[in-house]
Amino acid sequence: MKLVLALTTEANQAKAEALAAQLLEQHLAACIALQQQQSLYHWQGRIERDSEVQLLIKTSPEQLEALQIALHQMHSYDVPEWIVLPAECSDGYGSWLTSSLKPPLPKPGDAAEPGL
């Protein structure tokens, strides 16, 4: 079964937990793992070094667009990390993941279900 792993970082544990909670409450992610790390990166002409928290976000391919939009609206960084990796999982894990996510919103132009 297919799933998507999305990576982003936040400035500290509190911000990472708040972002994770919002994404989970909106059922855009089934699980989010948090890990403290040291990051070295280029920013505005300098090399920066910061403690950050990596978020490993597990979601479905169908929820990816809504997740990306929500994450970019909520994120504390001007340019948040957004890396997406396709992945495979067991059928059992995939069933749990799917049941944890809300159905994606219809895209413009998609036909509405009869009776709606």
Predicted regions located by residue number:
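Positively charged, small/polar-rich N-terminal and surface patches that mediate targeting and assembly
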Residues: 1-116
